[in-house]
Amino acid sequence: MAIRIFIDQGHNPSGPNTGAEGNGLREQDVNYIVGVYLADMLRADPRFDVRLSRNSPTAILGTSNATSLAARVSMANSWPADYFISIHCNSNVNPAINGSEVYVYRQNTQAYWLAQHV
């Protein structure tokens, strides 16, 4: 059976929960493109079954930050997904601050191992 991976392209294109904006870029647009690219890469491997939170760049989930997140989690849980990957592009005005973040629900799990190898 294929591993089910739910990719959440964080934030909405308008309305609630739109994310950061700067230098002509909108976080939700970058997240959408990265999510589609990642989904395409994973779909090329038959070991993975992939779903996205937003199937179009104009899709809006929820009516507030809380309901937007709840909608994404509900979609993943109702599938049910084995892994939930939420893509975000954080920023800071200080160019010396950079890096990536990975959060997992529990240590000593397959998800924890995967997070350490991303």
Where do the model's predicted regions map?
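Short, intrinsically disordered, charge-balanced linker/junction segments flanking boundaries
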Residues: 114-118
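Catalytic-core regions of hydrolytic enzymes
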Residues: 2-113
